[in-house]
Structures are given as C-alpha cells and as structure tokens.
C-alpha cells in the first residue's frame, strides 16, 4: 500500500518570525516563497505544518 503524501507550498516569508518557525520551514524542506515540497503524511509532519500554518498552504493528499 502506498504511503499518503502531502504537497505543501510556502506562501509566507520567515523574515521577522521566531527562529523555531524558520527551522520548522527548513524541516519541511521549504526555504523560498512558492516552493513546493511533497512529504509523507505522518503525525510529526502534520504537527510541523500546524506550527507554521500561517506560512504554508497544503494542496491536499497525493496518493
């Protein structure tokens, strides 16, 4: 069975944000605006997305 993935796009700048939010974006493999990253749908990734929800857009499940 294929692992579900999430497609995440960075829509906000990490400038003037807390260092932990910048590090979370790096952990999500995002470092510039409008970059898209495909990540496995795990509880840890969902938690990271929730932490920077104001800076990213989730495009949905990619099976």
Curated annotation (Swiss-Prot):
One Pfam family recorded for the sequence: Ribosomal_L30
GO biological process: translation
GO molecular function terms listed in the Swiss-Prot or TrEMBL record: structural constituent of ribosome
Keywords noted in UniProt: Ribonucleoprotein, Ribosomal protein
CDD domains, alphabetized: Ribosomal_L30
GO cellular component annotations of the record: cytosolic large ribosomal subunit
Coiled-coil features, chain-numbered ranges: none
InterPro entries registered for this protein in UniProt: Ribo_uL30_ferredoxin-like_sf, Ribosomal_uL30_bac-type, Ribosomal_uL30_ferredoxin-like
UniProt keyword Ribosomal protein, yes or no: yes
Assembly mode: Part of the 50S ribosomal subunit.
Family: Belongs to the universal ribosomal protein uL30 family.
Protein name: Large ribosomal subunit protein uL30
Name of encoding gene: rpmD
């Amino acid at each position: 069975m294929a692992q579900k993935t999430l497609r995440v796009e960075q829509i906000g700048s990490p400038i003037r944000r807390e260092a932990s939010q910048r590090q979370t974006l790096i952990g999500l493999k995002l470092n510039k605006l409008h970059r898209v990253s495909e990540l496995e749908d795990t509880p840890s990734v969902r938690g990271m997305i929730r932490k920077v929800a104001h800076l990213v857009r989730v495009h949905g499940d990619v099976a």
